[in-house]
Amino acid sequence: MQEDTIIQKNLFAIGNDINEQKKITKIPENLSLEDLKKESQKRPRQRKNSTNLINKFKTDLISNNKNVCINEESYSYKTVSKLKLTPVMKHYVTLKEENKDRLLLYRLGDFFECFFEDAVLISNLLEITLTSKDAGKEIGKIPMAGVPHHAMERYCADLIKKNYSVVICDQLEKSSGNYGTPIKRGITRIITPGTVIEEGMLIAKKNNWISAIYLSEENSDESYEWGISKADVSTGELITLEGQSLSKLFDEIIKLDSSEIIVGSNTARDLLIKGNSQITYTVSQETNFGINEANYLIKNYFQIANLEGIGLKNLNNATRSLGGLLNYLEKINPSNLDKDSSLKISLDFPQIQYGHNKLIIDYQTQKNLEIKNTQRENNYVGSLLWSIDRTYTCMGARCLRRWIDSPLLNVNEIYKRQNIITNFLESKKLRIDTQNLLRAMGDLERLAGRACAGHASPRDLIAIAEGLKKLPRLKSIIELFKYDLPDWTDQLKNIDEGLLELADTISFKLVENPPLNISEGGMIHDGVDNILDGLRNLMDDYSEWLNKEESKERKISKISNLKIQFHKNFGYYISINKSKVNLAPQHWIKRQTLTNEERYITSEIKNKENKIFQIKSRASSKEYEIFCELRNIVAEKTKQIRSIAKSIASLDALLGLSITSVENNFIKPSLIPINDSMTKNSTKIIAGRNPIVEQLLSDKKFVANDISFEDNQKLIILTGPNASGKSCFIRQLGLIQILTQIGSFVPANNAEIKIADRIFTRIGAVDDQSSGQSTFMVEMSETASILNQATSSSLVLLDEIGRGTSTFDGLSIAWSVSEYLAKKIQCNTIFATHYHELNYLKNTNKNIQNFQVLVEQNNDQLIFSHRIVKGGSNKSYGIEAAKLAGVPKEVIEKAKSVLNSLEENNKLNYDIK
């Protein structure tokens, strides 16, 4: 028998050295069960115990150092005795006890370190080395892992993305240089997923919400009362709402799209997890949701006498949630960790979100219409937002996203947005000028937020100044606009002069391209501060001295290419080529030898070096002081900057919609108010198109279709085979409705749109395994929700009902639902169905009309035209569709035979119209 070989050091079956080939016995194949049992007995396998990370650390520590004594208490901050710890570790444990649920990064020299359990955890999360540190004679080694201080933000971003909160303990003073002298350290930052403000931790075009939920203590679904408040700390936006019933709360929670959700107890968290186990909640038991505490916190934070002025009167649940949110933010706010700091998280007055002033789009409808992400892959590309977003700023992109979440009901507000788009469409020059202004505009909302929190860099302030300097040119553009405009345009017409003065102040004090590291200096202009100018003059003198010293040493040594250079570790030194070593004078002191270079120092250079360092240090400190004062000035203008930024964001969103209109031939729709009893007109669209599908069909022409809910015919029965375009058509109507109510133009040749108070969809269904509901039960639950909540002003889009049960049960349910919608609710409805029998409803109800997807049949081949025409289809074409899918011919023939038999026995005696 020949033997197979395992060839080492080579993955491609050719050994580098035949002696390195290790021979093994050929592996037997096709063993029976008995053979496998014998094999198991011949070579029994040993059970391996699971090894957690702490045990692995112990094992590695012992193997690396045989003399280490393992002490169980040294692996957890909870069990270690603080009396036995070194002063530094005692301080670490004290801080960790105050932040049990957060990772603590503790500054030691050039690293931020973690110890005990945190070290083991971050070594795994960040894939960094787990090592050890001596914590005292009686404790011995403890786990340690750390990251370089200059890379701390990048590593924190990774931890935040994994939904961890981080506490930063930094050095509050520089080392004195005396070994053994303790350095003052303290918490300078608490970073949680919902409170990050750093640019690298945020998604530029998306809000980063933190939410707090107050939940009443009730026992039944419908009796639960709740309040939700959510804030974007980076932009200052604050929204609050309240409601009743757990089912509505669960839907709102999914729509929150929050990075962090705060609740006040484990009981509340456990109850909310039942609604959606995929969402993580932060339990903050020290956060108070009491009504009295909330009243005090809100009035104190916003500096108001009562809650009526901000719309919270009699909204106790919303008030409680807002109080809880402010309480939580107060506890983790960096400014509260530094009592002398005047900086804080700055939030706008709360926007009260009522159900009666916005188009309500529940989570299921958002998902079915693929408003912000695709349904199957959860991708941005292929969503409605993707198809219309042509914004130039991050502020504008976030604004457009918010508009899509909450479209308008007020036709006057919609008209005003349309008027901005009309102005842009009527003047290409106006459009291009605005594009050029906004193209390089910084994110003023978040830049101001960083300044307010004390984290803005010099480059952030420069970006703020550059943005504010564009305000006069934006004003001149707005003044050219015609028609009735939104209120926010007044801010751009009447610019706060203080903002322009602020921009000038920043430009006067900061250089155009300041360094990234603010401790290096070089960020403040000359002529800003007399003391700084004096220090810089001295530095220039010493620089001139160094040049003269370099010339002098060249003459003494006769080395023409000699240079005096600087190294951050060695200071100033004389550098010469190694070939010139024999020319080095005796007063030179050798400092370092490199491959092609020799480095020396002299007593004169060393003497001057100390003085240069002192002056540089004083100059850098002075620059930092001037910069911090400037940053505080900017922080005081945070609300004004953010307010003007929101106006710019709205302008950008509408500019983007105008560009979308130009690119895709959108038109301005006419509007019918929601409570207009003077007209019987309803939604009518000529040559409407699906904005998403049309853009995805790059090589094909989209087939446009008409739709009309006229003459009180509120319900449309839409029939046609699979893949013919029914789902695309009903989604198309929903998308056009949303576009209309955000103020956009729409993809059609002509459109008259009745404003809707809510959009309901029931499109497709799958098992809900988490709640144990079958496909049919999910479908029926969604249908029940629509029938119980829809009003005559709603838009209902149904794609199949009754598929998960028997044919006659399903048909009966679909029939009854259709009649209920047409007769009782009387809202605009499209019902796409395979039950062509539903076409007969038109004969019994004047509120119902039939439409079908036109299909041509040629020699048993289906040809889809994707055209929607009046009249019902008398065939479902299911067998033909099965044939197209590749079902065997024998099955197809049998299906035809069965169908003929069923149709003869169950034929309804009506003519389809």
Swiss-Prot record:
Coiled coil: none annotated. One of its GO terms (cellular component) is cytosol. ATP binds at G720, P721, N722, A723, S724, G725, K726, S727. The keyword Ribonucleoprotein does not apply. Keywords: ATP-binding, DNA damage, DNA repair, DNA-binding, Nucleotide-binding. It comes from the Bacteria. GO terms for molecular function: ATP binding; ATP-dependent DNA damage sensor activity; damaged DNA binding; mismatched DNA binding. One of its GO terms (biological process) is mismatch repair. Belongs to the DNA mismatch repair MutS family. NCBIfam families: mutS1, PRK05399.1. This protein is involved in the repair of mismatches in DNA. It is possible that it carries out the mismatch recognition step. This protein has a weak ATPase activity. This is DNA mismatch repair protein MutS. It comes from Prochlorococcus marinus (strain AS9601).
